[in-house]
């Protein structure tokens, strides 16, 4: 068996994010259960002034 960088490629096969119920983007983290885009399941939507795409 090989240990080191070559065996680290096996970690990237599974999907980390799934589709969010609120915003519909593929940003809901499966293990953390939080959307990276809208902040679901928090009551307030995730919004920052330095993010330009929704202004």
From Swiss-Prot:
Of which family is this protein a member? Belongs to the eukaryotic ribosomal protein eL37 family.
Recorded GO terms, molecular function? RNA binding; rRNA binding; structural constituent of ribosome; zinc ion binding
- What function does this protein fulfil? Binds to the 23S rRNA.
Keyword field contains Repeat: no
Protein name from the UniProt record: Large ribosomal subunit protein eL37
For the ligand (Zn(2+)), the binding residues are 20, 23, 35, 38
Q: Which top-rank group of organisms is this from?
A: Archaea
- Explain how, and how many, cofactor molecules are bound: Binds 1 zinc ion per subunit.
The entry's cellular-component GO terms read: cytosolic large ribosomal subunit
Q: Which stretches are zinc fingers (C4-type)?
A: 20-38
What does the entry give for GO biological process?
Answer: translation
For this UniProt record, give its keywords in alphabetical order, as a comma-separated list: Metal-binding, Ribonucleoprotein, Ribosomal protein, RNA-binding, rRNA-binding, Zinc, Zinc-finger
Its cofactor is:
Zn(2+)
Fetch the SUPFAM superfamilies from UniProt: Zn-binding ribosomal proteins
Kindly list the cysteine pairs connected by disulfide bridges.
none
Which species is the source of this protein? Nitrosopumilus maritimus (strain SCM1)
Which Pfam families does the protein's record reference?
Ribosomal_L37e
């Amino acid at each position: 068996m090989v240990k080191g960088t070559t065996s680290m490629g096996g970690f990237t096969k599974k999907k980390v994010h799934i589709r969010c119920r609120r915003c519909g983007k593929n940003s809901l983290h499966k293990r953390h259960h939080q959307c990276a885009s809208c902040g679901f399941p928090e009551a307030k939507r995730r919004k920052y002034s330095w993010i330009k795409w929704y202004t």
